[in-house]
Regions:
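Extended substrate/RNA-proximal surfaces in nucleic-acid metabolism proteins
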Residues: 1-117, 121, 187
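Charged catalytic cores and adjacent phosphate/nucleic-acid-binding surfaces used
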Residues: 91-106, 110, 114-194
Length: 194
């Protein structure tokens, strides 16, 4: 938590250094428990009239190339790892996360592997060995070919097949709940989780 609070202030400073106006107090007023995310920053800066002509933000305004999901696209473009407003945070390892999920009665599933594997499907083998029990084969981020590929991988590894749209409300306005490419009755997937 302390890391996230410190990172919030650093992200705001880094966005300012990029030449984008941001009211830190307004960002903090939108933040749950004081944690400012890249999406919150995007919402604040894109609604600030002083940024209306900022060339860095033009792609996120209506009609822009990144306007389909402006808040999360801003995050990916400026606040994700390797980007100008990225701030490193130490998280628990995947192995620890999987163990914690299992210990608390959950089912560890690899979400949107088409993105999370970053084009390196060979990583799946090591992730399976860490103990995941399922894979989100159906994802709004996947093409039909990727859906089929991850279904095949799930079957080969004996993993549960899940699906998700990655709906996040206003953060991803072009992503709709339940829209993730499942071409069959999803009850078999649901029943497998019981």
């Amino acid at each position: 938590y302390d890391q996230e609070i410190a990172a919030s202030k650093q992200k705001i400073d880094l966005v300012r250094k990029m030449g984008i106006e941001i009211d830190a107090d307004e960002a903090l007023s939108h933040a749950k428990d004081g944690i400012v995310t890249g999406e919150i920053i995007a919402e604040i800066v894109l609604n600030d009239p002083s940024n209306a002509d900022n060339p860095l933000l033009l792609p996120y305004f209506p009609g822009g190339a990144r306007a389909d999901n402006p808040y999360v696209n801003f995050y990916w473009d400026y606040c994700s790892q390797g980007k100008p407003a990225y701030v490193h945070i130490d998280y628990i390892s995947m192995k620890e996360a999987i163990s914690l999920i299992i210990e608390t009665g959950g089912v560890p599933v690899l979400a949107h592997p088409g993105i999370n594997l970053e084009g390196r499907p060979e990583l799946l083998d090591s992730i399976v060995k860490l103990g995941i029990k399922g894979i989100e084969a159906y994802s709004s981020y996947h093409s039909p070919d990727q859906n089929r590929y991850f279904i095949q991988q799930a079957q080969e590894y004996g993993l549960l097949i899940t699906g998700g749209s990655d709906f996040h409300g206003k953060t991803k306005p072009s992503v709709f709940m339940g829209n993730f490419g499942l071409e069959q009755d999803g009850m078999a997937l649901f029943n497998a989780l019981k």
